[in-house]
Amino acid sequence: MNIGILGTGHYLPTNVVTNNDLEKIVDTNDEWIRTRTGIRERRLATEEVDTSDMAFHAALGALEEANLAAEDIDLILVATVTPNTSFPSVACIIQDQLGAKNAAAMDVSAACAGFMYGLITAKQFIDTGAYKHVLVVGAEKLSKITDWSDRTTCVLFGDGAGAAVVGEVGEGKGILSFELGANGAGAKELYLNHDDHIIMNGREVYKFAVRQMPDSTVNVIEQLGLSRDDVDYLVPHQANIRIMEAARERLGISEDKMAKSIEKFGNNSSASIPMALSEAVKEGKIKDNDLIVLVGFGGGLTWGAVALRWGK
């Protein structure tokens, strides 16, 4: 069975926060932020908007593109580190909002690599024959766990959600290879402290990311007997432009073949890859039969990469 992505969707809060806005609350400026992160603005959800609200809207878009009803979904997986509350899961909340009465539902926690973990979990469930259609969502309200007095981290993060419907696709299409990994020895480099604020060792995370993203990309390509020259489009975790560019240059992939939503969206953790993917699809940057690589890394430390042939 060939299993791939039938539809994508993403949602952004309407509240735009520019670098100039951040100058008013921390000691920073637009040039400092842009040169170090590539970010010009990010979207922040208002207090009354929950992670589940953003996940719901992204899911609607993915269902519409897949031409499926909510009742057609057998399982909902939501990757998030910012659920509304510890429980119930965001997946259960949007199951009700969507009217997906036939779906099981659970959240996945693998930080910025969460969508990759969710996507491969969806594939494995479908491979068994137990389920036919799985909705995978990455959704984050990072603004609620950001320390707005820490200029090294508060400039990075934004809120939003991205979604994909996974199911059977045509011959030669869909997910062709994948890699998932973790190294718990690096847990202290990126974590949520007891004050519910993100703590990051930027230097160590950078060193890890610029090594792991290219290595994982090469691994999933070589599993197919192909080379990096065969990649039509790369969708990396939108962490930081310096990390993304360093990884791209190591891979020798041209700039026009890499998704860059970070300038407008910021770093959206587990939502960043599905948001960037959905935007690229909507803008026509990804075409039928393209070989796509999705690759990300996150706290844990965790990482994941997926190679897929685009199309239904």
Curated annotation (Swiss-Prot):
Q: Tell me which UniProt keywords the record has, alphabetically.
A: Acyltransferase, Cytoplasm, Fatty acid biosynthesis, Fatty acid metabolism, Lipid biosynthesis, Lipid metabolism, Multifunctional enzyme, Transferase
GO process terms (BP) = fatty acid biosynthetic process
Main localization is cytoplasm
Cell compartment(s), UniProt: Cytoplasm
Question: What chemistry does it catalyse, as a reaction equation?
Answer: malonyl-[ACP] + acetyl-CoA + H(+) = 3-oxobutanoyl-[ACP] + CO2 + CoA
Instruction: Indicate yes or no for the key word Electron transport.
Output: no
Single Gene Ontology MF annotation: beta-ketoacyl-acyl-carrier-protein synthase III activity
Annotated active site residues, numbered on this chain, are 112, 237, 267
Q: Which domain of life is it from?
A: Bacteria
Write down the InterPro entries for this protein, in alphabetical order.
ACP_syn_III_C, ACP_syn_III_N, FabH, Thiolase-like
- Sorted alphabetically, which SUPFAM superfamilies does this protein's record hold? Thiolase-like
CDD domains, sorted: KAS_III
EC id: 2.3.1.180
Using the UniProt annotation, give all residue ranges assigned to the region (ACP-binding): 238-242
Q: Which GO terms describe its cellular component?
A: cytoplasm
Pathway participation: Lipid metabolism; fatty acid biosynthesis
**Can you quote the domain comment?**
The last Arg residue of the ACP-binding site is essential for the weak association between ACP/AcpP and FabH.
Could you tell me what this protein does?
Catalyzes the condensation reaction of fatty acid synthesis by the addition to an acyl acceptor of two carbons from malonyl-ACP. Catalyzes the first condensation reaction which initiates fatty acid synthesis and may therefore play a role in governing the total rate of fatty acid production. Possesses both acetoacetyl-ACP synthase and acetyl transacylase activities. Its substrate specificity determines the biosynthesis of branched-chain and/or straight-chain of fatty acids.
The UniProt subunit note reads as follows: Homodimer.
What family classification does the UniProt entry report for this protein? Belongs to the thiolase-like superfamily. FabH family.
Q: What is this protein called?
A: Beta-ketoacyl-[acyl-carrier-protein] synthase III
Source organism per entry reads Oceanobacillus iheyensis (strain DSM 14371 / CIP 107618 / JCM 11309 / KCTC 3954 / HTE831)
